[in-house]
Structures are given as structure tokens and as C-alpha cells.
Amino acid sequence: MAKLYFYYSAMNAGKTTTLLQSAHNYRERGMRTLILTPKLDHRAGSGVVASRIGLRADGRIFERDTGLQQLVERDIHNDGALHCVLVDEAQFLSRAQVWQLSEVVDRLRVPVLCYGLRTDFRGELFEGSQFLLAWADELEEIKTICHSGSKATMTVRVDAQGHAVQDGPQVEIGGNERYVSVSRAEFKKIMRGEGRIDPLQIALPLPVA
């Protein structure tokens, strides 16, 4: 039975690597997949999904107002049977798009695998993540480690000096130099201004100011 899956984590846990491996596993068995990627994430090039370890694949771009159920229906009409839809950076989905993906599962009987962040740099849920957590059939955390050795569950945005950025837009694309995964305790610490973090040396502990 087709299901809606949400694989969530903090930054740098290997979400995109896992997505690309899943897509490869389907294709290896002669099954066709469709990878969806948000237009605003163009770090690897428009329509390209790429992991930090070098894996890459072409994806279909969607915008915030794209009807995803209709997109999938057109894909099936044009290219034939579809065995899986995979969504990269799923935190950027709108509420309506999460519902549309649930319709892909329930009406079209195509499994949908979504990969994304759970919370933003303020510790608040993204819209897409909020409704995936509410509506997905299966939830799975992809784990990663904080420099403190604890499980990283939060993402902090830092400036060039390694200090926490607490204001600004929720959606701002950046790589390892802007965002760092930390435990909840370390998140509280740096948000209080107690030290700094070097985003290029994420193994180092936070020094106390």
C-alpha cells in the first residue's frame, strides 16, 4: 500500500544522500521515479539535486504555487507508470502542497518520500514540515551529531563571526558556512550569546564567552 513518508533531521544528516540512494534503488529494479526539488534551492544548479558527498540527479522544479498532484498526473500521462515520488527540501512545501502529495498517495497509489528539515534557525517548524508531521503515514528521523557529542536536533544560523543570527527571513538558502546542526542544549547556549561557533570546524565545542 502506498504511503506518505517524512524523513526529517537537522542540517548535514545526509537527507539528500538518502533520497538519491532511494531513487537509485528503485531505478535499479526497473522502476521509474520522479524527484521534486524547490526552485529556490539552486545551490547545485537549477533542477539538480546534489548531496555533500557528490551524488547528483536531475529533479523536477516546483514553486510554491505549483500544483503537485497535477504535476504528477501529467508526468504519468506523458511517461507512463510511476513507482515513487521523492521530494527534496520538503520543508519548503506549502500546506496545500503537502495535502496534494497525500492525494498522490491516496488517489494515484504512488508512494511519496519527503526529506527535509523539521525546524528553522529559530527552532520553529517550517510550514511544510508542520503538515508532514501532521499528515504523513510514516515519520523517521535521520540522525546526526552535535559537536558536543549529543544528538543534533536543532539548526542554528551563524554570521561570519560565528555568532547566532536570530532575525531575518525563515527561508534563506545556504550551505555549511551559514547553518550548523546542534543539540537543543547547545542551541540555547549560542542563542543566549554564550560563545561562538565556527561553521567550517563543526567538530569544535562552543567556547564560553
From Swiss-Prot:
Its EC number is 2.7.1.21. Keywords: ATP-binding, Cytoplasm, DNA synthesis, Kinase, Nucleotide-binding, Transferase. This is Thymidine kinase. Homotetramer. It is found in: Cytoplasm. It comes from Xanthomonas oryzae pv. oryzae (strain KACC10331 / KXO85). GO terms for molecular function: ATP binding; thymidine kinase activity. Coiled coil: none annotated. ATP binds at S9, A10, M11, N12, A13, G14, K15, T16, D88, E89, A90, Q91. GO terms for cellular component: cytosol. The keyword Cytoplasm applies. Its main location: cytoplasm. It comes from the Bacteria. It catalyses: thymidine + ATP = dTMP + ADP + H(+). The active site is at E89. Belongs to the thymidine kinase family.
